[in-house]
Regions:
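Hydrophobic alpha-helical membrane-interfacial segments at the cytosolic entry of transmembrane helices
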Residues: 15-24, 204-230, 276-284, 298-307, ...
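Extracytoplasmic catalytic/substrate-binding loops of multi-pass membrane glycan-assembly enzymes
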Residues: 33-48, 61-76, 83-86, 438-442
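Aromatic- and kink-enriched transmembrane "portal" helix at the membrane-lumen/periplasm boundary
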Residues: 85, 99, 121-148, 157, ...
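Short periplasmic/luminal acceptor-recognition loop of GT-C membrane glycosyltransferases, typified by
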Residues: 416-488, 495-520, 547-556
């Protein structure tokens, strides 16, 4: 035992990296395959790369609102390892590894080794293996998870450049930032923070900055070049850009952006006040419990109580004000902060602009909040002076460890509970999935019916969305309208949706309700008054309806 302890002391960084890698693999093996809500965005991430490998061109033959690198990455993995759920999960493993090791590299430059390790383990459980649509094994968007992972890698390389002055690290940072941009466009704004370093904080020569810009452009140029090689035209690019503009300014999208913190609205003030109240209760109660612990046994009990408090104080909102706090911290303490910390704060703010007015531990926050949490800890550690609450820096460190332990315990219980709900197996040629029983039964019924009465390559449509069924059955959607949820419905236009349904000549059309599908503050889209549904009912025969709880699938078949 002493040999192990001594080895850990001598090789702490190496051991911590090994621990993170082992925990990543164990968590991946334990949680993979168990998902809920696969009728939502999951399907898009499954089917688009398959369509690309079948000769369809993104933005030309496939209606897409996201940047291409994530889909190109998965398409490459399909080519290497086969088109399957396992390959998608393997992509997730690679992305999680980059994500958590990059985060650890950043943390280790500022924080105690124990804090850095515990923070990354907590993030691994809370974000990597999250029991919702916004996990990182099979996420709502590979482009987002790949992009944020490259963004964190970029930040890590810049921090290490500050320490070592090795310019190749900065080249790597610009390269990674370019990859983040090619995967998720908004993450390219990180370039502003890196330019602050190369031009001001730690200036490079003109020649080096030229290389920096070349490195940034490499992935975007290669990604776009591949599309052009496949046949995309300048006109296609402009058409795709125009559709993205329309899509992201629809009524439903603006509602969604406001709800997820992208826009400040007065209607959110009650939520802000509630969050402040709940955060205050949690922090005061947790500090009281922390201050009363006298040994490890009482500390474990106290951590368990704090983890329970996370549930009753709506912990999803505990991170709500992080971007605003970082801005305030930067303004108030900029003169006493090192250039590395200033860069870190700017980077964390930029990466959380999408949820600036309400960074919640939900949806996109699972991906972007970790860097903000890390940065806040670094900022507080730098500016907190000795006081009654924290007589020494070590007291503050212990309290951080206490809080992280509570969050880690809470999310571990949450993830395992969600996994237990996803307990109903169904098998397809693409792999095995475990879903909640109320979702698995209707989906399984639809899949078996499709496989029995259609052939591979024939077209089916699932409304409002459900391209996972297309992927699992090898029945293609129409690339020009693979889905038509409320966002796409508003962006495409009702008449065009109806025209696409008429021209695509589907063998079957499925209307789904429930399955975690969101309606963006409005009523269910495909009700009896919907013109598109009326058209489908006039041209197709309703063959069957299957319902399990709130989850319903209506099957319409082409008459013969």
């Amino acid at each position: 035992m002493d040999k192990i302890r001594n080895f850990y002391k001598e090789k702490t960084q190496l051991c911590n990296v090994a621990i993170l890698l082992v925990m990543t693999l164990i968590g991946w093996l334990f949680f993979k395959g168990h998902y809920s809500n696969i009728m939502t965005d999951f399907g898009r991430e499954m089917i688009f790369p398959q369509l690309m490998n079948n000769g369809n061109v993104l933005y030309k033959d496939i209606l897409c609102i996201y940047f291409p690198l994530g889909y190109q990455f998965v398409a490459l993995m399909y080519t290497l390892f086969g088109t399957s759920i396992f390959t998608l999960e393997l992509c997730g493993l690679l992305v999680i590894t980059i994500f958590v090791l990059s985060l650890y590299s950043i943390a280790a430059n500022f924080l105690d080794n124990k804090v850095s390790l515990l923070l990354c383990l907590t993030v691994l459980i809370a974000s990597g293996f999250n029991g919702t649509l916004f996990n990182m094994i099979l996420p709502y968007s590979v482009g987002f998870t790949l992009g944020i992972s490259f963004a964190l890698l970029s930040v890590s390389l810049v921090i290490n450049y500050f320490k070592s002055e090795k310019v190749y690290l900065l080249y790597g940072a610009f390269l990674s930032c370019g990859a983040a941009f090619a995967a998720k466009g908004e993450l390219g704004l990180l370039l502003i923070a890196i330019l602050y370093v190369s031009l001001c904080a730690k200036p490079c020569s003109i020649r080096q900055n030229i290389v920096n810009i070349f490195c940034f452009l490499l992935f975007p140029v290669l990604s776009l070049g591949l599309l052009m090689f496949q046949g995309i035209t300048v006109s296609d690019i402009f058409n795709a850009a125009e559709f993205m503009r329309i899509f992201f300014t629809t009524k439903s999208m603006l509602f969604h952006i406001a709800k997820t913190g992208g826009i400040f609205t007065l209607s959110n003030i009650p939520i802000y006040l509630s969050a402040i109240f709940n955060i205050a209760i949690f922090l005061f109660a947790s500090y009281f419990l922390f201050s009363k612990t006298i040994d490890k046994r009482t500390q474990i009990v106290a951590i368990g109580i704090s983890a329970y408090l996370l549930n009753i104080t709506t912990c999803w909102r505990h991170t709500m004000f992080l971007p605003i706090l970082l801005v305030i911290g930067l303004i108030c303490y900029r003169k006493q902060l090192s250039k590395e910390i200033i860069f870190l704060i700017i980077s964390a703010i930029i990466l959380n602009l999408r949820m600036f007015w309400g960074l919640i531990l939900s949806t996109y926050g699972f991906y972007t909040a970790p860097i903000a949490i890390l940065t806040l800890i670094v900022l507080l550690q730098s500016v907190i002076t000795e006081n009654k609450l924290f007589p020494t820096k070590n007291t503050f460190k212990k309290f951080v460890i206490y809080l992280l332990s509570a969050y880690c315990l809470f999310f571990a219980v949450f993830d395992i509970t969600e996994r237990m709900k996803n307990d109903t197996e169904f098998r397809t040629e693409k792999g095995v999935l475990y879903l909640p029983k109320s979702q698995a039964n209707p989906i399984n019924t639809a899949i078996k019916y499709i496989q029995s009465y259609t052939s591979v390559g024939q077209k089916i449509l699932v409304l409002p969305e459900g391209t996972a069924i297309n992927f699992l059955t090898d029945r293609n959607p129409d690339g020009k309208m693979p889905m038509a949820d409320r966002l796409y419905y508003e962006a495409i236009g009702e008449e065009v949706v109806m025209k696409n349904v008429a021209e695509a000549d589907y063998e079957m059309i499925f209307i789904a309700e429930g399955f975690g599908l969101t309606h963006f503050g409005a009523k269910y889209l495909y009700d009896d008054k919907n013109p598109v549904l009326k058209y489908i009912q006039s041209k197709y025969n309703l063959d069957w309806v299957v319902k399990d709880g709130d989850n319903i699938i209506n099957c319409y078949v082409k008459p013969y």
